[in-house]
């Protein structure tokens, strides 16, 4: 019979907290004209990627969504991708 105390236990996996890419000293500013930056936060289907995936803070996520919607309205970004 195997003693339970003899079985090696795994160390618990701790996921490292991601930091917001728009916070900090030399962080990029969210601007609706910066299409290259905004495209990183849009999925291949043209949807805005949620903050739990991109690790953007709640305040900056709202700002980012507003900039993406403004760029779409002005024709800088597509609404849907084919």
UniProtKB/Swiss-Prot annotation:
InterPro entries: Ribosomal_bS18 (IPR001648), Ribosomal_bS18_CS (IPR018275), Ribosomal_bS18_sf (IPR036870). One of its GO terms (molecular function) is structural constituent of ribosome. GO terms for biological process: translation. One of its GO terms (cellular component) is cytosolic small ribosomal subunit. The keyword RNA-binding applies. It comes from the Bacteria. Residues 1-20 are annotated as: Disordered. Keywords: Ribonucleoprotein, Ribosomal protein, RNA-binding, rRNA-binding. Pfam families: Ribosomal_S18. Binds as a heterodimer with protein bS6 to the central domain of the 16S rRNA, where it helps stabilize the platform of the 30S subunit. NCBIfam families: S18. Part of the 30S ribosomal subunit. Forms a tight heterodimer with protein bS6. Belongs to the bacterial ribosomal protein bS18 family. This is Small ribosomal subunit protein bS18. The gene is rpsR.
């Amino acid at each position: 019979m195997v003693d339970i105390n003899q079985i090696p236990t795994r160390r618990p996996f701790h996921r490292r907290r991601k930091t917001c890419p728009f916070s900090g000293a030399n962080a990029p500013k969210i601007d609706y004209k910066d299409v290259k930056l905004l495209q990183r936060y849009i999925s291949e289907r043209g949807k805005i990627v949620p903050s739990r995936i991109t690790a953007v803070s709640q305040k900056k996520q709202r700002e980012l969504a507003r900039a993406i919607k403004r760029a779409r309205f002005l024709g800088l970004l597509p609404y849907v991708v084919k």
